[in-house]
């Protein structure tokens, strides 16, 4: 879901590593320890929560989180909570990073001091205000200046303890006066529409002929200001909660025209002062924020076409895609957008086959084949992550969940054994888990995605052709990816592959480490199994599996997934779990009588049906076949005064659902839309609001079967595994190429040097793989030209946007301290990425 701007789409995403907290304040009790967790928030909306780390003042989280950001935001915030079993969890402190400051910490481990949390630290939102001066002639013939203050609306106010019933006080304040008025309370909304006008007398009556129109005395206006305070009406004994304030000096009204603008709410001037840094501890984070500005598809045609023909270039090292891998500092930087682009256009197998064959030809020892972090290895890794994730889940998730839930001790290192544990019993537990994992993997070959099988076939053929005397190389070329880079890492760190929601506990993590090591060795088909382990206890344990049947099972599996023309007969028939989780749904009114209330339910989506049940594992209460989903669209907040709602439209009715946050709502809408995209009866129009009290709230039509009044969005690809935007990936490649332009130019110089000089070359030139200098130079020239053309388009867009930008508009409210930073970014830095 992109934020639409004139002429382009803006995509925001963030990748976060939450490391650890240190030196948290002690608990005021005899135990002194705390049970803490960390949340990730867009402004104050929670989008992710870590597991609870018990009894620690230095909790280690080690959790990763990635999301596409579906809306604008000002701060990326992190809150450390102390869990309380009997009361509401208490906040220890927070880290708030301004959006414009995220680039300062880009992809760097950084320690942040925790800050205190109070009403002033939580201020957010903006107010639409209009001020107008008017003259009133009294009965005695004198003139009074009166100020009309109109508060129209607010947006994005903070939600306090799960509710927001806001009202505003409007005060005309000066050295010798303070006159306050109050709006009505708006219930259950943090986007209140007030539209109330308040009048204040701002000058003493004076003769009409004394001064010109609106020429009131300077000492009056210079010392007066309008202050708007937002409050949350509360029934608690502690009184109403402060939400924020703004102050407008009346100097802005020296012109005859009215003043109308948006303002950001600010904390109070006399707000509570935070304690000195370090009092609350610190939090280690690594944040990567990306913002892509994507033009329409035709802008990218030259660069995209150049990239897509990479597989056909001879030699492949002279292709645009291979050149990108050469200039990037990390091969993975290039591999991620390249693989996604090639998958989108069906060119990933030819490209990987070409670069793999070239790498095999350069390899001298069959024992080191595909063992480095080359562009080939990184591209295959990325392909397996994208195309093989559902396969991985179907194969491993049930067994991984069983291991996590069993809590059986599998420690076989005599030094690590706990008191009372039996080495023989632990070894048997571990053997059973390894056998189970090995069995599900080697029996899963028929389910391996076709694109992976086609790549494995090309690896097998290239390796066998290069090392004809080594009969095992056709297996090791494939096992180095499917076992060493796919299954073994997923077993070792299941949370990174969404097999578990969080990091596992230390005992389970140790078990998975031992299982992963054994599976990796079994899959490698190493001739000397015992030498594969540094630890003697692992070598002893491996004797359980030193039988020919294990090697035969691995070879049969590798033969199956690397066979030419193999297709997956289960790809359509087999139910695949796509997404599941708790959400809140509104009763659909299937019964004639009964309340249409809201209930928390466990939702489950497969490629066959969308169901909900009371709890995970319970029988379904209701099922919607995928073919009956006619549209999936957002539901306007005003329908039920609830955020993050969407609707799943069926032939008879719509199912209204509330997700936990905006990120989760986007994820559900996207996956439901994708899986139902090919339905023949999909709607073209829908109702963006609910049908309540005998009419649609959006168009006021009275019939519940009335045709929709707004066009459906849709437009996503039908492939349930892959949601790839080709233009966005080309934009990312442009961004990378632009940032590495100096290395592209150096590579051009290296091509020229090699064309005319055969002697020793400069050290910086020797890092590039250049098999054909003339062909490589030709491609480089085209890449530089394509990047330059896009650079000009971005520069023109920045200039146009700069001219349109208005301080005080809804997009750039007054009081935004980042506005000058925004102006500087628009005039100095590239617009394609932050």
UniProtKB/Swiss-Prot annotation:
Chain ranges of zinc fingers (Btk-type): 679-715
Modified residues (Phosphothreonine): 110
Function: Inhibitory regulator of the Ras-cyclic AMP pathway. May bind inositol tetrakisphosphate (IP4).
Phosphotyrosine carried by residues: 66
PH domain boundaries: 576-677
Domain Ras-GAP: 346-561
Compositional bias ranges of the Polar residues kind: 818-834
Any Pfam family the entry gives: RasGAP
Gene Ontology BP terms: intracellular signal transduction; negative regulation of Ras protein signal transduction
Record-linked PROSITE patterns: C2, PH_DOMAIN, RAS_GTPASE_ACTIV_1, RAS_GTPASE_ACTIV_2, ZF_BTK
Keywords: Acetylation, GTPase activation, Metal-binding, Phosphoprotein, Repeat, Zinc, Zinc-finger
Gene3D superfamilies membership: C2 domain (2.60.40.150), GTPase Activation - p120gap, domain 1 (1.10.506.10), Pleckstrin-homology domain (PH domain)/Phosphotyrosine-binding domain (PTB) (2.30.29.30)
Residues found modified as Phosphoserine: 77, 809, 833
Disulfide bond entries: none
Domain of life: Eukaryota
Sites of N-acetylalanine modification: 2
Molecular function, one GO term: zinc ion binding
Protein name: Ras GTPase-activating protein 3
Region listing for Disordered, in residue ranges: 806-834
């Amino acid at each position: 879901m992109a934020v639409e701007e004139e002429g382009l789409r803006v995509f925001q995403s963030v990748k976060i590593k939450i490391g650890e907290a240190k030196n948290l304040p002690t608990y005021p009790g005899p135990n002194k320890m705390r049970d803490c967790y960390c949340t990730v928030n867009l402004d104050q909306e929670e989008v992710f929560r870590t597991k609870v780390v018990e009894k620690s003042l230095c909790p280690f989280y080690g959790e990763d989180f990635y999301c596409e950001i579906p809306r604008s935001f000002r701060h990326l915030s992190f809150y450390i909570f102390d869990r309380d079993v009997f009361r509401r969890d208490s906040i220890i402190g927070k880290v708030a990073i301004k959006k414009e400051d995220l680039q300062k910490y880009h992809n760097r481990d950084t320690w942040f001091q925790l800050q205190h949390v109070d009403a002033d630290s939580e201020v957010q939102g903006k107010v639409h205000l209009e001020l107008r001066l008017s003259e009133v002639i009294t009965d005695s013939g004198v003139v009074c200046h009166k100020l009309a203050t109109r508060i129209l609306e607010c947006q994005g106010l903070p939600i306090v303890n799960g509710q927001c019933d806001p009202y505003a006080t409007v005060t005309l304040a000066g050295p010798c006066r303070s006159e306050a008025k109050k709006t009505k309370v708006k219930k259950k909304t943090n986007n209140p529409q007030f539209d109330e006008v308040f009048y204040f007398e701002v000058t003493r009556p004076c003769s009409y002929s004394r001064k010109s129109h609106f020429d009131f005395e300077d000492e009056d206006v210079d010392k007066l200001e309008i202050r708007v305070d937002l409050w949350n009406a509360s029934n608690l004994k502690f009184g109403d909660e402060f939400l924020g304030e703004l102050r407008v000096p009346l100097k802005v009204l020296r012109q005859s025209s009215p003043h109308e603008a948006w303002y950001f709410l600010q904390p109070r001037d006399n707000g509570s002062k935070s304690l000195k840094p370090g009092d609350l501890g610190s939090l280690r984070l690594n944040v990567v924020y990306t913002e892509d500005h994507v033009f329409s598809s035709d802008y990218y045609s030259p660069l995209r076409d150049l990239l897509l023909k990479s597989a056909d270039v001879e030699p492949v090292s002279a292709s645009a895609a291979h050149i990108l891998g050469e200039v990037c500092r990390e091969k993975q930087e290039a591999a991620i957008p390249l693989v996604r682009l090639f998958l989108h256009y069906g060119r990933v197998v030819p490209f990987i086959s070409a670069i793999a064959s070239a790498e095999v030809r350069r390899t001298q020892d069959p024992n080191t084949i595909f063992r480095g972090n080359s562009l080939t290895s990184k591209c295959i890794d990325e392909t397996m992550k994208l195309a093989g994730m559902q396969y991985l889940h179907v194969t491993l998730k049930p067994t991984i969940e069983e291991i996590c839930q069993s809590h059986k001790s599998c420690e076989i290192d005599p030094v690590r054994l706990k008191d009372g544990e039996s080495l023989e019993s632990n070894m048997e537990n571990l053997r059973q888990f390894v056998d189970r994992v090995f069995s599900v993997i080697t029996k899963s070959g028929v389910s391996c995605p076709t694109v992976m099988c086609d790549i494995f076939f090309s690896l097998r053929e290239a390796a066998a052709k290069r090392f004809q005397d080594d009969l095992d190389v056709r297996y090791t070329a494939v096992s180095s990816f499917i076992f060493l880079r796919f299954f073994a890492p997923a077993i070792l760190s299941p949370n990174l592959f969404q097999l578990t929601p969080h990091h596992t506990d230390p005992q389970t993590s140790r078990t998975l480490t031992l299982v992963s090591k054994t599976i990796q060795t079994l899959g490698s088909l190493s001739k000397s199994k015992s030498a594969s382990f540094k630890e003697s206890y692992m070598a002893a344990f491996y004797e359980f599996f030193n039988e020919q049947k294990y090697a035969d099972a691995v070879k049969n599996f590798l033969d199956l997934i690397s066979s030419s023309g193999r297709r997956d007969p289960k790809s359509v028939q087999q139910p695949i779990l796509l997404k599941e989780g708790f959400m809140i749904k509104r009763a659909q009114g299937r019964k004639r009588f009964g309340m249409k209330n809201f209930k928390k339910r466990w939702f489950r989506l497969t490629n066959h049906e969308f169901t909900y049940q009371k709890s995970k594992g319970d029988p379904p209460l209701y099922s919607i076949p995928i073919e009956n989903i006619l549209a999936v669209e957002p539901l306007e907040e005003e329908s039920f005064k609830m955020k993050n709602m969407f609707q799943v439209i069926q032939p008879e009715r719509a199912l209204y659902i509330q997700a936990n946050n905006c990120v989760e709502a986007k994820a559900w809408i996207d996956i439901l839309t994708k899986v139902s995209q090919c339905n023949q009866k999909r709607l073209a129009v829908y109702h963006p609001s609910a049908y309540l009290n005998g009419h649609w709230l959006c168009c006021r039509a009275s019939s519940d079967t009335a045709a929709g009044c707004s066009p459906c969005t849709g437009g996503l690809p039908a492939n349930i595994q892959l949601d790839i935007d080709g233009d966005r990936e080309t934009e990312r490649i442009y961004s990378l190429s632009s940032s590495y332009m100096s290395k592209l130019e150096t590579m051009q110089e290296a091509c020229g040097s090699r064309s005319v000089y055969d002697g020793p070359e400069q050290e910086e030139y020797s890092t590039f793989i250049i098999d054909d200098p003339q062909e490589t130079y030709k491609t480089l020239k085209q890449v530089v030209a394509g990047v330059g053309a896009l650079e000009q388009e971005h520069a023109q867009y920045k200039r146009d946007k700069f001219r349109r930008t208005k301080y005080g508009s809804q997009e750039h409210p007054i009081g935004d301290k980042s506005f000058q930073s925004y102006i500087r970014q628009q005039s100095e830095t590239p617009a394609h990425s932050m």
